[in-house]
Swiss-Prot record:
SMART domains: Transket_pyr (SM00861). Keywords: Glycolysis, Oxidoreductase, Thiamine pyrophosphate. It is an enzyme of class 1 (oxidoreductase). GO terms for molecular function: oxoglutarate dehydrogenase (succinyl-transferring) activity; thiamine pyrophosphate binding. The gene is odhA. It comes from Bacillus cereus (strain ATCC 14579 / DSM 31 / CCUG 7414 / JCM 2152 / NBRC 15305 / NCIMB 9373 / NCTC 2599 / NRRL B-3711). InterPro entries: 2oxoglutarate_DH_E1, 2oxoglutarate_DH_E1_bac, DH_E1, KGD_C_sf, ODO-1/KGD_C, THDP-binding, Transketolase-like_Pyr-bd. This is 2-oxoglutarate dehydrogenase E1 component. Its EC number is 1.2.4.2. Its cofactor is thiamine diphosphate. Homodimer. Part of the 2-oxoglutarate dehydrogenase (OGDH) complex composed of E1 (2-oxoglutarate dehydrogenase), E2 (dihydrolipoamide succinyltransferase) and E3 (dihydrolipoamide dehydrogenase); the complex contains multiple copies of the three enzymatic components (E1, E2 and E3). It catalyses: N(6)-[(R)-lipoyl]-L-lysyl-[protein] + 2-oxoglutarate + H(+) = N(6)-[(R)-S(8)-succinyldihydrolipoyl]-L-lysyl-[protein] + CO2. The keyword Lipoprotein does not apply.
């Protein structure tokens, strides 16, 4: 039998006849020898077997043995126990948590039990019979019911029943049922809270009246979001937290910037006015972004403590900032200045994510990110989630935007405690915030606050919400603001009088007017419309020598091939590794995986930490990497990169969950916050990377131009056409090339292990500098072990990465060369294999082949210098394995036209336009590929006469 844990044990105080009766019924329940009352049967399922404990001590401190005379019959006691548990579990259904609605109608769940118990019945039952830890002043079951209904069915409502850990559940119930959570605030704090609400409301109303019609995505209706964030931040600081990371969308963002992150009002007004103001710190890139997307970093303090708060930049793609901010936090928590895995201290930082009530259940990135919360590679010691719940998504009502009762219900599946709170009850909101931060700091797990309010205006300030929600907006129009409600409460309590409240309001208004007066007129100069990329970005990555001495490489390789005594490496893996033993000797050959490990080790020895994640990254999708070894007897793991000498930087490689978007966002965020770290994400197959397309579009490619947010993230995207069908062929390089501009990233498709070695080392060398940018690599599959991609030790020890490579033994007679073939990646190796096979009749004196290793930025000078050698060149051909509407062709075509000039033709050889990236028939694939290779190398082939679908010619 499974026993469920709970904070109330109904058997704890049963004695005499009552205990005997319950035990008798339990025996019948266990043996099945007779019928048991359904209510008792349910309690046996919940609480297990009854057991003897000490006598009850009632409110008058008199020891009491239960009997039918002083406790009522057993059935009534059990009904009370059930009622207590129902209030705890379902009290939220009765709670008044929505300021736009009357108290929730949860009568069906609780009223039946209440109707079967009179006040006299409840008064006859001692409190500790049904609530073992009843606080002082609670003497009878009637007191218990009144107290618990006051706790669970007012403006705070709780959902804890789904929490699996009994210790956590007991702590949560104890916190909310004791007096500690709702201690009255001091008059000083209540006055400060009113001042904060006055500032929030005053700021929003000032914007509303001063910048009529401009979008601001007002916080009004959930104004308490600002004090809630204040409370969480400062309570975190009291616990020693150094960094608080906040992710949120545009709703309420301007008020959070102005108040939580202390962005001066004058700077906010200048952005609305399009004016330049002295002292404003640029927090955007050269193209910039709208004001409600921008982030900020600020040290926040009070008289006692301080902490750094970071509000992440984000687009309007709702919730996609979530994993980015989690990556920030993990980077802030880890010490990467030692070998082995980094040391993580989750008390150093935590995340607050502000969600929308429609977006939280609606966007899949939310559940992807929640799934990271307990994983070793991604957990950050607990995130505090706040749903800024205004009960509408643009024009869509909640009944059209989710299939659950609450917008927060998704969180139940991740074992997250949930508090619903009425946003018109300020002190209840602060209580929820306090519970959240205490739980997070104690249990290192997520917590969710559902802050339920309303939206005073439309989705934006030019929108009329009454068109689609006429009834609710009649209510909202006449509904007082939370500031007004709280001001009335403080006046009624004698904390402030009307004049003092008015003084607070006037002070806020004067401050706003004064700050607005500091803003100069709008800047209408031409300079504001001319976008200039910083010179260091425009120049691109300058040549960097990345070779490593052979002796150092040999020492590294020796270390990579050693493991602790008694560690039993899987025999097949051991053979793979042992083949690498002589790879750096005179006649040795270095394959892709070894080149990668050598690059990693040398980068670590130079003090650069490395983090690599992906769905199979420890072994490698194609069983090539084996960077983490598993003992065949114990399943213990060992990574040689953790034990190499002369390393003072961490190395972590993790298998990720089956998610692309959240993991890419997380790694991007980690890299932004730890710019000195080589952070790499590897797709299982490049084909699957497009499920993270929003992250590539909004963050990785454009983050620096929009927000000045630098990243050196590396994307490893397995790519290559091998007859494996449309889901295992293409990383869709065309999409990355379409996004390529302003030297925003490097896109490469390499053909040798040495090139991979050098480009990784080059990327590591630019981390933390102004020259840094992401690196998008189309990585190989079949080429991982292809003999034509192997490299020698000298190719690693000398030189640097080459953006373009010429095919060896071609172009030896420059005056005879008529065709220059350009290709990249696996296509270039297929051409090389055909050339070296000798099984052809082409006149190769008339052909030269160049491999474009770096697609973007295109190595124009290098290719131009090659073209100049061939005085009789007639055509430049781009050859690719992808369909014409995919791959690099549409990116390459204008480049080739410019390179060719007026006298040289340009052309394309490859598959025709197709809707699917690849066919599914391996035999058809092979035939097509052979035809592409043959036509590319055969100068006699006349494009303009042959209309076969396999190639298209462009003049």
């Amino acid at each position: 039998m499974t026993r469920k844990n709970t904070t109330t044990n109904p058997w704890a105080k049963f004695h005499g006849p009552n205990l005997g009766y319950v035990i008798e019924q339990y025996d019948l329940y266990v043996t099945g020898a007779g019928s048991v009352d359904p209510e008792l049967q349910e309690l046996f399922e919940i609480f297990g077997a009854p057991s003897f404990q000490d006598d009850v001590v009632t409110g008058d401190n008199t020891a009491t043995h239960f009997s039918p005379q002083n406790t009522g019959n057993i059935e009534k006691i059990l009904k009370v126990v059930q009622l207590v548990e129902q209030i705890r579990s379902f009290g939220h259904t009765l709670a008044h948590i929505n300021p736009m609605e009357d108290a929730a109608n949860g009568q069906s769940l609780l009223e039946k039990a209440m109707s079967e118990l009179s006040d006299a019945d409840l008064k006859a039952i001692p409190a500790k019979t049904v609530w073992q830890d009843a606080p002082e002043g609670i003497h009878t079951a009637l007191d218990v019911i009144h107290r618990l209904k006051d706790v669970y069915t007012k403006s705070l409502a709780y959902e804890f029943s789904h929490i699996q850990d009994s210790e956590e559940r007991a702590w949560l119930h104890q916190m909310v049922e004791s007096n500690s959570l709702r201690q009255p605030l001091s008059n000083k704090k209540r006055t400060a809270l009113l001042k904060r609400l006055t500032a929030v409301e005053g700021f929003e109303q000032f914007l509303h009246k001063t910048f009529v019609g401009q979008k601001r995505f007002s916080i009004e209706g959930v104004d308490m979001l600002v004090p809630v964030l204040d409370e969480i931040v400062l309570e975190g600081a009291k616990n020693g937290v150094e960094d608080v990371m906040i992710g949120m969308a545009h709703r309420g963002r301007l008020s959070v910037l102005a108040h939580v992150l202390e962005k001066p009002y004058s700077h906010m007004f200048a952005e609305f006015k399009h004016a330049k103001i002295e002292g404003a710190v640029a927090n955007s890139g050269w193209t910039g972004d709208v004001k409600y997307h921008l982030g900020r970093e600020q040290v926040v303090s009070n008289e006692e403590v301080s902490t750094r708060v970071t509000l992440a930049n984000n687009p309007s793609h709702l919730e996609f900032v979530n994993p980015v901010v989690e990556g920030f936090a993990r980077a802030a928590q880890e010490n990467r200045k030692k070998s082995g895995l980094p040391d993580q201290d989750t008390s150093k930082s935590f995340v607050i994510l502000v969600h929308g009530d429609a977006a939280f259940p609606g966007q899949g990135i939310v559940s992807e990110t929640l799934n990271l919360s307990r994983l070793n590679a991604y957990q950050t010691g607990g995130t505090i989630h706040v749903i800024a719940n205004n009960a509408v998504g643009f024009t869509t009502d909640s009944y059209d935007s989710r299939s659950t009762k609450y917008s927060s219900d998704l969180a139940k599946g991740f074992d997250i405690p949930i508090v619903h709170v009425n946003a018109d009850d300020p002190e209840a909101c602060l209580a929820a915030a306090n519970l959240a931060i205490q739980y997070r700091m104690l249990f290192k797990k997520d917590f969710l606050i559902d802050l339920i309010g309303y939206r005073r205006y439309g989705h934006n300030e030019m929108d009329d919400p009454a068109v689609t929600q006429p009834q609710v907006y009649k209510k909202i129009k006449n509904h007082p603001t939370v500031r007004a409600i709280y001001a009335d409460q403080l006046q009624a309590a004698g904390v402030l009088n009307a004049d003092e409240v008015e003084t607070i309001t006037q002070f806020t208004q004067e401050q706003l007017k004064s700050d607005y007066a500091q803003v100069p007129p709008a800047d209408t100069s031409d300079a504001t419309i001319h976008v200039k990329v910083p010179d260091v970005v425009a120049k691109g990555i300058q040549p960097i020598d990345t070779g490593v001495e052979i002796d150092s490489l040999r020492a590294i390789n020796e270390g990579l091939l050693s493991w602790p005594e008694g560690f039993n490496v899987y025999p097949k893996v051991k053979k793979i590794l042992e083949r690498r033993k002589d790879a750096l000797e005179e006649n040795g050959k270095i394959e892709w995986a070894l080149a990668e490990s050598l690059a990693f080790a040398s980068i670590l020895q130079e003090g650069t930490p490395i983090r690599l994640t992906g769905q199979d990254s420890q072994r490698g999708t194609f069983a090539h990497r084996h960077i983490v070894l598993h003992d065949t007897d114990t399943n213990e793991t060992y990574s040689p990169l953790h034990r190499l000498p002369n390393i003072n930087a961490s190395f972590s490689v993790h298998n990720s969950p089956l998610s692309e978007a959240a993991v890419v966002g997380y790694e991007y965020g980690y890299n932004v916050f730890a710019p000195e770290t080589l952070v790499m994400w590897e797709a299982q197959y490049g084909d699957f990377s497009n499920t993270a397309q929003a992250l590539f579009d909004q963050y990785v490619s454009a983050g620096r131009a929009k927000w000045g947010q630098k990243s050196g993230l590396v994307l490893l995207l397995p790519h290559g056409y091998e007859g494996q069908g449309p889901e295992h062929s293409s990383a869709r390089p065309e999409r990355f090339l379409q996004l390529a501009a302003e030297n925003n990233w490097t896109v490469a498709n390499l053909t040798s292990a040495a090139q991979y070695f050098h480009i990784l080392r080059r990327q590591a060398s630019i981390l933390g500098t102004e020259a840094v940018r992401p690196l998008v690599l189309m990585t190989p599959k079949s080429l991982l072990r292809h003999p034509l991609t192997l490299s020698t030790a000298s190719q690693l020890s000398e030189g640097r990465f080459q953006p373009a490579l010429e095919q060896e033994n071609l172009g030896m007679k420059p005056n005879k060369v008529k065709r220059l073939v350009l290709s990249t990646g696996k296509m270039a190796i297929d051409l090389a294999a055909e050339i070296e096979s000798g099984k052809h009749e082409y006149n190769l004196d008339e052909v030269h082949v160049v491999r474009i290793e770096q697609l973007y930025p295109f190595p124009a000078e290098k290719v131009q210098s090659i073209i100049k050698r061939f005085k009789n060149l007639e055509e430049i051909i781009w050859v690719q394995e992808e369909p014409r509407n995919m791959g690099a062709w549409h990116y390459m075509a204008p480049i080739l036209f410019e390179l060719a000039g007026d006298k040289v033709k340009t052309g394309y050889i490859g598959r025709p336009d197709r809707s699917s990236p690849s066919g599914g028939d391996p035999f058809a694939h092979k035939a097509e590929q052979e035809l592409i290779v043959a036509h590319a190398l055969d100068v006699k082939y006349n494009f303009r006469q042959d209309k076969q679908e396999i190639e298209v010619y462009s003049n």
